[in-house]
Amino acid sequence: MSAIVDIIGREVLDSRGNPTVECDVLLESGVMGRAAVPSGASTGSREAIELRDGDKSRYLGKGVLKAVEHINTEISEAIMGLDASEQAFLDRTLIDLDGTENKGRLGANAMLAVSMAVAKAAAEEAGLPLYRYFGGSGAMQLPVPMMNIVNGGAHANNSLDIQEFMIMPVSQTSFREALRCGAEIFHALKKILADKGMSTAVGDEGGFAPNFSSNEECLNTVVQAIEKAGYRAGEDVLLALDCAASEFYHEGEGVYQLEGEGLKLSSTQFADYLANLCDKFPIVSIEDGMAEGDWDGWKTLTEKLGTRVQLVGDDLFVTNTKILKEGIEKGIGNSILIKINQIGTLTETFAAIEMAKRAGYTAVISHRSGETEDSTIADIAVGTNAGQIKTGSLSRSDRMAKYNQLLRIEEDLGDIASYPGKGAFYNLR
């Protein structure tokens, strides 16, 4: 038995200089698991609650000492002596201890830090790499990366309404080559922007945040960068968008306001706007193409694009099986973004991935805009054979930590490692 003998929570800083929660779990054998949790910028209204102190005299009210205290007192008392290899039981213990629907009492940040640290300790105890501990002998597929190379919306101070413009290398036969492709395009784009006298400063997730006049101008420039790097857009590399449409949806009026382009569009018009972009550019994936509360708009978008474009629900589904189940039954979207801190435990995270796959939906494992050096999501992506990962651009070490971990995993897998390429979009025609 891998008995838990000590649990230590602490306040550390994330990639934006904001406090977050880190946890160490020590087992009887002497092995330790350590995990730090991420934090989002654009968040879904139904996400599990991230507990912040609200004390304006510390970190502008963003301290997490209450969450840390919960780890070091209540949570510690509840799981001390339990078997770390019983992940589902441990997570259920945390959920019952919290006792709320949204984890608002103990805080999803406290609960997730413990859940992840327990899994890491148990993997160490078992002598297994984390991805293998999660997925067993069947874990062998590396994910296609969604690389956010241009930031707009809530992730940047520019006139782009769409939050993320991403590239997805798909013609390569290994993750290593896909990563090289992405890096070369990133540097080609930097040169193009510099030559145009545009900003090459990077945003929260490592992408550039220049002041393009329209979404189309941005997409044209990304295609130019792909070609400048020696790749073919639509063949070697596909494009993906994260609209984060909830951020510019005006519920009272029922319109999507693209301020950068001076447009006010109904749900149907915005679906047409996105379809037009997909006709002009090799876009394979659109995340949060409608607002989280606009289910009629989501239905329209799914009927219009759902057979040829991956339509990913992030704010829509918030990694929650109850909401995902409703979406599946209503034919909303065809993919779910998986963010571990939206739901707050690993067991619930894996349940959402499993439900999506059973329904023929894809699952994209994702970082948050406020990240740490913790690379657990890389192991989750391989351990669940998810096929796709979204973990930022080709700069900032908080993003590189995940890519570098995937390189190590691919090396560890050796000849049995596979890279799905276009096969990651198994539900598109």
From Swiss-Prot:
The keyword Heme does not apply. One of its GO terms (cellular component) is phosphopyruvate hydratase complex. The active site is at E205 (proton donor), K339 (proton acceptor). Keywords: Cytoplasm, Glycolysis, Lyase, Magnesium, Metal-binding, Secreted. It comes from the Bacteria. Mg(2+) binds at D242, E287, D314. GO terms for biological process: glycolytic process. It is an enzyme of class 4 (lyase). Signal peptide: none annotated. Its EC number is 4.2.1.11. Its cofactor is Mg(2+). PROSITE patterns: ENOLASE. One of its GO terms (molecular function) is magnesium ion binding. Binds a second Mg(2+) ion via substrate during catalysis. It catalyses: (2R)-2-phosphoglycerate = phosphoenolpyruvate + H2O. CDD domains: enolase. The keyword Lyase applies. Belongs to the enolase family. Catalyzes the reversible conversion of 2-phosphoglycerate (2-PG) into phosphoenolpyruvate (PEP). It is essential for the degradation of carbohydrates via glycolysis. This is Enolase.
